[in-house]
Amino acid sequence: MTQGRQKDELKDITLLGNQNNTYEFDYRPEVLETFDNKHQGRDYFVKFNCPEFTSLCPITGQPDFATIYISYIPNIKMVESKSLKLYLFSFRNHGDFHEDCMNIIMNDLINLMDPHYIEVWGKFTPRGGISIDPYTNYGRPDTKYEKMAEHRLMNHDMYPEKIDNR
């Protein structure tokens, strides 16, 4: 029989269930929290769908809106979802290009969790008649995940969806 999480396993989770959280508008990677992966002997994907991402254009200061998809194969640590929500919210006043935001998010999550594999895909709403959908991924070097990352990158978005203003 599988047991649930014990209190000592949750000691580093401070944001989930906390009604006194503040929503910071400036980039704050330190808000991210992790917990242990109890299934380290198994490969599996964890996917976050984040439909309310907002950042700022670094030139005009205009807001950019996106749905972000974060998928990863955990190793030892996993990101706690409320901390991820607060982290993504912290991009609200962050001025950067779409491509930079996706790579920053991926790099922060790699530094936090050291996953086997991770990919971050942003689907931004159009501005000026053009939507931008940056995709970035990473597979642990010298492992099957490195080959997986290369394969997924080379085959990414081969059949783009019909865009009807998102």
Curated annotation (Swiss-Prot):
Pfam families: QueF. Substrate binds at residues 79-81, 98-99. Pathway: tRNA modification; tRNA-queuosine biosynthesis. It is an enzyme of class 1 (oxidoreductase). It is found in: Cytoplasm. Keywords: Cytoplasm, NADP, Oxidoreductase, Queuosine biosynthesis. The active site is at 57 (thioimide intermediate), 64 (proton donor). Its main location: cytoplasm. The keyword Oxidoreductase applies. Its EC number is 1.7.1.13. GO terms for cellular component: cytoplasm. InterPro entries: GTP-CH-I_C/QueF, NADPH_dep_7-cyano-7-deazaG_red, QueF, QueF_type1. PANTHER family: NADPH-DEPENDENT 7-CYANO-7-DEAZAGUANINE REDUCTASE. Catalyzes the NADPH-dependent reduction of 7-cyano-7-deazaguanine (preQ0) to 7-aminomethyl-7-deazaguanine (preQ1). NCBIfam families: QueF-II. This is NADPH-dependent 7-cyano-7-deazaguanine reductase.
